[in-house]
């Protein structure tokens, strides 16, 4: 907001406490004209076509998928989804791939000993390229991220190096 990257935002949470804290931060930073908050289960309080981008972050992958599924019409009216599941990341990647989205950008950070992947998805009318890939390649892309792999993401490398290996 303060970098003028987006003109307006809507912060949504299902719980009052986090929303009240968000409102405190919004007021403290003088952003009440730019950011509104809504108490809502997922995307229920967002109207079709109301937003260009949807960010779903900081929750498990199953919940991310539930929110995307329940709010499918709102998601379809947005230009992009930015997702940061805390678990079951491969299931979220598989879900977006199988529901007509393409992951166009990804990043991964390491913070306090934890790895956090995030990815940007856009609607894709033709995801048939995946049909021509063998099952192992698709599984690896779902597990580790097609863009992270393609770009040789250094944090992904750290993540992979830490995996246990068999010693003889």
Predicted regions span which residues?
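Hydrophobic packing residues within well-ordered alpha-helices of enzyme cores
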Residues: 1, 22, 35, 64-68, ...
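Conserved SAM-binding loop of SAM-dependent methyltransferases across substrates and taxa
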Residues: 1-7
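Residues at the starts of beta-strands that form the adenosine-phosphate
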Residues: 8, 34, 80
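Class I S-adenosyl-L-methionine
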Residues: 44-50, 62-168
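Glycine-rich, N-terminal phosphate-binding loop of Rossmann-like dinucleotide-binding domains
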Residues: 58-59
């Amino acid at each position: 907001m303060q970098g003028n990257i987006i003109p307006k935002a809507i912060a949504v949470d299902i719980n009052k406490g986090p929303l009240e804290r968000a409102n405190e931060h919004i007021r403290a930073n003088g952003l009440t004209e730019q950011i509104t908050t809504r108490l809502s289960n997922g995307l229920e309080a967002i109207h079709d076509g109301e937003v260009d981008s949807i960010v779903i972050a900081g929750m498990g992958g199953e919940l991310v998928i539930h929110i995307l599924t329940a709010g499918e019409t709102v998601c379809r009216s947005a230009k992009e989804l930015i997702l940061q599941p805390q678990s079951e990341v491969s299931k979220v990647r598989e879900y977006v791939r199988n529901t007509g989205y393409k992951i166009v950008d990804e990043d991964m950070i390491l913070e306090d000993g934890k790895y956090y992947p995030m990815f940007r998805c856009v609607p894709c009318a033709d995801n048939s390229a995946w049909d021509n890939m063998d099952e192992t390649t698709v599984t690896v892309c779902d597990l580790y991220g097609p863009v992270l792999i393609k770009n040789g993401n250094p944090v992904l490398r750290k993540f992979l190096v830490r995996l246990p290996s068999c010693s003889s």
